[in-house]
């Protein structure tokens, strides 16, 4: 169902102005309490790139409230964890980290502990924190992030715990202050939420339904990023291929890519994530025709067996998926494809798992993100019968990884001797070496001075190491 032009899912400017007033109030309170010392915040982000982008906005609000940042929670006045709900492992890690903060709180009662993000949108998690973690001060979900200044002010001024995990389809908050972690790589969210309801996935329940940002705003932000010297812009959405479907009269994702590609400047465009059922020939043709769009496609297949794909509610067959890859490579022979795979979905047999092994051999992925199925409470898959043991699934997982290693080794070995345009990103672990990425999103390390960081250089591949490359400057 299309949103009507009159439906308002954007946070009103009056509300944003109100939150800016709370930023000032927090600044005043802390300035008095700390005798003029600048308060420090420790921010830790779990999960996906969308969470990283959200944290940049939360850090922007913190800066507006007068905060600086520290890498050590012991030195901080507040500690903020932006959480992930996708896998059980993230939940275990979070509570392990939160428990460690209790000692800091005991030494410094004014130290504030804040939990936010996807995991906090789950009612059972909020209840667990309320009952078992009384030293946590503020909890808010994904739909209340723009109200962070108000929530912090309430906690500071009353000394009481503050919880805000309202359930809604979500909103879009534009024009929030932003603290970017990089000066040359930028995350640019184009939409939020998801309408797909894959049976194993909690995201639609914690992120809400799909909400596309205005293309005018996105293009304007991209233009400003290029003007500011950014060399890589990654467009973010749970399913970028659905962009515009919820806004009457809005352009689709392929058209948005073309518009950003037409911005003058030397930069590359990446995007994630694409859902195979919505990945069209139009989009693949657009990727091929737009010289600034990186020839890298992350296209999560999740499984290679049709019965399991149907149980996952993925909306495509293995044959349709492979046909899509065949077309993609016909228009982009240099395309690098990566994917996600879940091993041991409830009811999956070993024979069905072998269909996934066969699929990756046909797909020839550059790399894979593989996970053993992790049930998430509230999803349909969590209620499905799951007779295969974790130990047995672990054996399947190892078999899949071994098969992918051979594929990746062959693909990277074929790159030796060739030259690639690389964005130089950071110092490598080895002294005198720089780490960068090819357009195909493969890490390559090479000897160079730190002055090249943030620039494009041509690098010749001299050695392949399965998941990464070594090289030398060729320009």
Cite the ranges covered by each PLM segment:
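Short flexible coil/turn linkers enriched for glycine and charged/polar residues
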Residues: 181-184, 194-196, 293, 303, ...
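Conserved, mostly hydrophobic/aromatic
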Residues: 198, 218, 235, 271, ...
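Glycine-centered loop/turn positions within well-structured domains
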Residues: 146, 196, 241, 306-307, ...
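Active-site proximal loops enriched in glycine and acidic residues that flank catalytic Cys/His/Asp
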Residues: 237, 273, 301-303, 339-343, ...
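Terminal RNA-binding accessory module
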Residues: 5-9, 383-475
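Radical SAM enzyme [4Fe-4S]-AdoMet core and its adjacent flexible, acidic
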Residues: 48, 244-261, 265, 312, ...
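Conserved SAM/AdoMet-binding glycine-rich loop
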Residues: 110-115, 124, 227-350, 361
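Proteins enriched for Cys/Gly/acidic motifs involved in redox and nucleic-acid/cofactor modification
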Residues: 1-243, 282, 297, 319-330, ...
